[in-house]
Swiss-Prot record:
Protein name, as recorded: Guanine nucleotide-binding protein G(i) subunit alpha-3
Region (G5 motif): 324-329
Gene that encodes the chain: GNAI3
Keyword check for RNA-binding: no
Protein family according to the UniProt entry: Belongs to the G-alpha family. G(i/o/t/z) subfamily.
Subunit structure comment from the entry: Heterotrimeric G proteins are composed of 3 units; alpha, beta and gamma. The alpha subunit contains the guanine nucleotide binding site. GTP binding causes dissociation of the heterotrimer, liberating the individual subunits so that they can interact with downstream effector proteins. Forms a complex with CCDC88A/GIV and EGFR which leads to enhanced EGFR signaling and triggering of cell migration; ligand stimulation is required for recruitment of GNAI3 to the complex. Interacts (inactive GDP-bound form) with CCDC88A/GIV (via GBA motif); the interaction leads to activation of GNAI3.
UniProt source species: Cavia porcellus (Guinea pig)
Length: 354
């Protein structure tokens, strides 16, 4: 009897080849879809990373889209100067010039009646005089003692530009805007032949219960930490240090059974603010046991170790750490390029293609 295959055998071989081919195609397709979850405590820079993805991978914000952010820029600017003025009362700081007390009263009147998206020359003048006051600057230098947006000085220092009648926010202005994320914001983009689905989830405690809905099929988690938060307390709990809250949260995510096989990427963000702050505010505020110097390199490395040491599966799970400045497009582009290479490698491994 010869070794020739019967028609049925040939059909079976073809079917087997087709199944193998389909499995491989499915594997390759799965390897090209990336579900990224952006997690972290409130105000750690997650939404800014999402905005950067639009700038880097989706041709940025159109002029029309930038115009829509004018309302937010003005709101952030006004709320920042109001927060400083209110803090002066709590911290018992006097105005450098007594006449500024009248400006402060005028600020509250004008801010209360301001039309959305408009900044009158009268309101801009009041804010400008207040911001230049010595007492206001003294209070601003103590901003760790109250809640103040990171973008406060950025907008207030640029008041002449942003208060022009023909003002259109720049991409950088848009990046600096602060709007609390509620719910889940989904962004899609393509990069390095991969189709990314990025989910930005509100970081305040009240928003975290919504995270569970995003967990299924996650390729990688980008966990954002604001390095500059080491000497601040939470807006929602003034007894809790923000860095301690971030560590607690990272511990629960990093060691969660849901994420045993999920790549964890740690963004130690706001490195620019941290580099300035560490010169005047010691790391021992957050870590009393710290004995190193208050230099950027040593203090940042210590914080990195504090987070990486929370990983209880070091033998099987690697944490990929990057120092970032979410408002710096070039920095984010460079870091995200490296992150994508890690995702590609790990994704192909899981699909048996690496």
């Amino acid at each position: 009897m010869g070794c020739t295959l019967s028609a049925e055998d040939k059909a079976a071989v073809e079917r087997s080849k087709m199944i193998d081919r389909n499995l491989r195609e499915d594997g390759e397709k799965a390897a090209k879809e990336v579900k990224l979850l952006l997690l972290g405590a409130g105000e750690s820079g997650k939404s800014t990373i999402v905005k950067q993805m639009k700038i880097i991978h989706e041709d940025g914000y159109s002029e029309e889209e930038c115009k829509q952010y004018k309302v937010v820029v003005y709101s952030n600017t006004i709320q920042s100067i109001i927060a400083i003025i209110r803090a002066m009362g709590r911290l018992k700081i006097d105005f450098g010039e007594p006449a500024r007390a009248d400006d402060a009263r005028q600020l509250f009147v004008l801010a209360g009646s301001a039309e959305e998206g408009l900044m009158t020359s009268e309101l801009a003048g009041v804010i400008r005089r207040l911001w230049r006051d010595g007492g206001v600057q003294a209070c601003f230098s103590r901003s760790r003692e109250y809640q103040l947006n990171d973008s406060a000085s950025y907008y207030l220092n640029d008041l002449d530009r942003i208060s022009q009648t023909n003002y259109i926010p720049t991409q950088q202005d848009v990046l600096r805007t602060r709007v609390k994320t509620t719910g889940i914001v989904e962004t899609h983009f393509t990069f390095k032949d991969l189709y990314f689905k990025m989910f930005d989830v509100g970081g305040q405690r009240s928003e975290r219960k919504k995270w569970i809905h995003c967990f299924e099929g996650v390729t990688a988690i980008i966990f954002c930490v604001a390095l500059s938060d080491y000497d601040l307390v939470l807006a929602e709990d003034e007894e809790m240090n923000r860095m301690h809250e971030s560590m607690k949260l990272f511990d629960s995510i990093c060691n969660n059974k849901w994420f045993t096989d999920t790549s964890i990427i740690l963004f130690l963000n706001k490195k620019d603010l941290f580099e300035e702050k560490i010169k005047r505010s010691p790391l021992t505020i957050c870590y009393p046991e710290y004995t190193g110097s208050n230099t950027y390199e040593e203090a940042a490395a210590y914080i990195q170790c504090q987070f990486e040491d929370l990983n209880r599966r070091k033998d099987t799970k690697e944490i990929y750490t990057h120092f970032t400045c979410a408002t710096d497009t070039k920095n984010v582009q460079f870091v995200f390029d490296a992150v994508t290479d890690v995702i590609i490698k790990n994704n192909l491994k899981e699909c048996g293609l690496y």
